[in-house]
Amino acid sequence: MSTGKVALEVKELHAFYGKSHILQGVNLHVNEGEIVALLGRNGAGRSTTVKAIMGMVDNRGEVLWRGKNVLGMKAYEVAHLGIGYVPESRDIFPKLTVHQNLMLGQKSAKKLGRWSFDDMYKMFPRLRERQHIEAGVLSGGEQQMLTLCRTLMGDPDLIMIDEPTEGLAPAIVQLVAEYLMELKRRGICVVLVEQKLAIALQISDRVYVMGDRRIVFEGTPAELKADANIRKEWLEV
């Protein structure tokens, strides 16, 4: 449950790819225990925003994680502070088994986190069935499950997930939504980069809409549903 206490605050975030000015002053925040959706069309800057927060692209501004400015840190340093990132590319180690991939996600073999291997396999029984299979032969949906689970094994306090439902069957999409709600129940903040409006509005506490590489709307799912002009201008194809 959201406490109203700010966990992540982004102030005037700019990002650059070479000489290209991609993000132009993004401002957003995530409260403790909240699911926040970042919506927008392709090219709006959503993926670049989470990459800039992680320190994966050239940036300037402020990124405050529980009051500490992490801008300028390397991605692995940001991760060690408790921010997890699940890219759209479904990065796995294809020649390692499912279980070995999960083992690589552990922060420390000696430290017990919120999540165990059994937790992962209970949420995604298909991974249990295939735990000794090389990850490279998994379906796209199974690889998405594995990427999410491996990130969780690092015990993050906030997880940023880029297009987790892309290309997945409807039944798997709903499974991912339930999974994200379980993260919230366990006290983990979620930043969800998503194009499927229905799923984002179903599970999010608040939403941001991006357009022209900046934030053009902030509000609750109900407020976005009621604002036909914003949806038409910035979301509908």
What residue ranges belong to the model's regions?
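Glycine-rich phosphate-binding loops of nucleotide-dependent enzymes
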Residues: 2-237
